[in-house]
Amino acid sequence: MLKPLGDRVVIEQVETEEKTASGIVLPDTAKEKPQEGRVVAVGTGRVTENGEKIALEVKEGDSVIFSKYAGTEVKYDGKEYLILRESDILAIIG
């Protein structure tokens, strides 16, 4: 499994089927990049300038909303993930 370092988080993006107002299903090439996902792994936390380690607020299993162009897309074990910093996460859902 992927183990992110520091304040990074591994996200499994939630794919939703997009339809127009008239009910036409959009192909993958026309879809917006998803901004919602599930946290599958978290790093150990960030370190402040004076060496203090601050734990991350998100945890494995959290559903989150993140910045549209945040992170780095990676493929691991046949699945696609997004690795981003906790500061790129805008909200925890639920």
Curated annotation (Swiss-Prot):
The keyword Cytoplasm applies. One of its GO terms (biological process) is chaperone cofactor-dependent protein refolding. It is found in: Cytoplasm. Coiled coil: none annotated. Gene3D superfamilies: GroES chaperonin. It holds the Pfam family Cpn10. One of its GO terms (cellular component) is cytoplasm. Heptamer of 7 subunits arranged in a ring. Interacts with the chaperonin GroEL. Belongs to the GroES chaperonin family. This is Co-chaperonin GroES. The lineage of its organism: Bacteria, Bacillati, Bacillota, Bacilli, Bacillales. The gene is groES.
